[in-house]
Amino acid sequence: MNIPYTVEERPDTGLANGKLGIWLFLASEVMLFGALFSTYIILRVSAVEWPHGELNVWLGMANTFILIASSVTMVMAWASLKMQDWAKHRLYLILTFVLAGIFLVNKYFEYADHLSRGEGPSHSTFLAIYFTLTGLHGLHIVGGMIVMAYFIGPGAKLWKKNADQFANRIEYTGLYWHFVDLVWIFLFPVLYLL
């Protein structure tokens, strides 16, 4: 049995099936990160003392700018597809992938610094929350990179077979990527600045 891929909007939702699916998935992700942020708030409010200044603010700020830049390159990748410019699309998608990799390398050095000083997740409640939230966020970055690698590599063949379908998949990947970036926009001030 072959289920046809449709790019038309459904009359009952006003969205194509793929877009509805990604929005439902992102809603579940909002609940996941919302629960973790709520836990953070409860633990922080109930704590007698809360550590401040344990994180490298400059590295966190650099990562913020890296992810914002990656959001821009992801939009440019999708917009290039809409303008039928395959070469620019590929360039922007590769740039997004590279920026995500730079973000993860920065996180690696940040984690290594903490762990070398014996400051692992069991060191304090703050660091347990920090490693949980940023680790889960990092896994989402890796997930996005896997999807991008697929579209840079073997999945790129779809462009020649069905350009609309390929552009839709890049759009849905972009929605996911913007969500991942938005999560970091919340994580940075909560963990690094407050």
Language-model features: locations:
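...captures the hydrophobic TM-helix bundle architecture rather than a specific catalytic motif
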Residues: 1-194
